[in-house]
From Swiss-Prot:
Membrane recorded as keyword: no
Predominant location category: cytoplasm
Quaternary structure note: Acetyl-CoA carboxylase is a heterohexamer composed of biotin carboxyl carrier protein (AccB), biotin carboxylase (AccC) and two subunits each of ACCase subunit alpha (AccA) and ACCase subunit beta (AccD).
Species classification: Bacteria, Bacillati, Bacillota, Bacilli, Lactobacillales
Keyword set includes Ligase: no
Function: Component of the acetyl coenzyme A carboxylase (ACC) complex. First, biotin carboxylase catalyzes the carboxylation of biotin on its carrier protein (BCCP) and then the CO(2) group is transferred by the carboxyltransferase to acetyl-CoA to form malonyl-CoA.
GO terms under biological process: fatty acid biosynthetic process; malonyl-CoA biosynthetic process
The organism's place on the tree of life at top rank: Bacteria
Start and end residues of each CoA carboxyltransferase C-terminal domain: 1-236
GO cellular component: acetyl-CoA carboxylase complex
Organism: Streptococcus equi subsp. zooepidemicus (strain H70)
InterPro entries, per database record: Acetyl_CoA_COase_a_su (IPR001095), ClpP/crotonase-like_dom_sf (IPR029045), COA_CT_C (IPR011763)
Pathway: Lipid metabolism; malonyl-CoA biosynthesis; malonyl-CoA from acetyl-CoA: step 1/1
Enzyme class: transferase
The protein's name in its UniProt record: Acetyl-coenzyme A carboxylase carboxyl transferase subunit alpha
Amino acid sequence: MTDVARILKEARDQGRMTALDYASLIFDEFMELHGDRQFADDGSIVGGIAYLADQPVTVIGIQKGKNLQDNLARNFGQPHPEGYRKALRLMKQAEKFGRPVITFINTAGAYPGVGAEERGQGEAIARNLMEMSDLKVPIIAIIIGEGGSGGALALAVADQVWMLENTMYAVLSPEGFASILWKDGSRATEAAELMKITAAELYQMGVIDRIIPERGYFSSEIVEMIKLHLIDEITQLQAKPLEELLDQRYQRFRKY
C-alpha cells in the first residue's frame, strides 16, 4: 500500500474522532444550537457556542456517524443546504457578538440528491463562501478526516486552514476524479497520487497553514496540541486590525 493509499484509508476510517468529539474535548461548556430557521435541522452539520479557555467561540463541524444508525441520522456526513444555512446562521451570530469561529471538516462532499438541489444546494454553498470571505471575526478551519469538494470548502474559507496528518483535502473524491478522467472509479488510488490530496503536499503548496501530527485517533496529545495552537493563533488573529485580517484572508485565497 502506498503512502497516499494509506492516508486515504485512514482519512475515511469510521473510528476517527468526530466534530462532536473535538467540541467536547477541546472546549468547555459546549452548547449545541439547532436549525437554519428556514427549513430544517440538518444532523450532518453540528454547531454551537463554547469557551476556549476563557474566550467565547462558535464551533461548527460536519458530523459523520460511528455506526450505521448514526450515519443514517447524519446522512453519512454529507450536508444538505439547510446544514450550510445553519452553519451560516451561527457564523453571522458569531460576528454579531464578536466570537471567533472554529470549524471541523470531515465530508466526502455536499449531498447531491434531487431534494438538496431543489432547495438550493449550490446557492447555500456559494453564499457561505461569500459570507465567510468577509466575516468580521477570526476563522480557523481544521480538516479532521475527508475534505471533499465544495462541501468542505463551504466551511473552510478561513484565516488559517489546518489538517491532521492522515487526512485529505481535494476538489472531489479520488473515485470521482478517476471516473471523469479514465471512466474507471476503481483507479481511485492512482488518481489520489495525481491529485496531491495529503497534508504534506498541500502544506508545501501553501494551501494549508499547519499540519497536526497524529499518534492515534483518540490521543489526548492531539486534542491538547490543537487546543494550544487554537489559543495561540486566535490571540494573534484578534490582535490584528479588522481591515488587515480581512485583506489577508482575501489574499490567502486569491493566490490560488
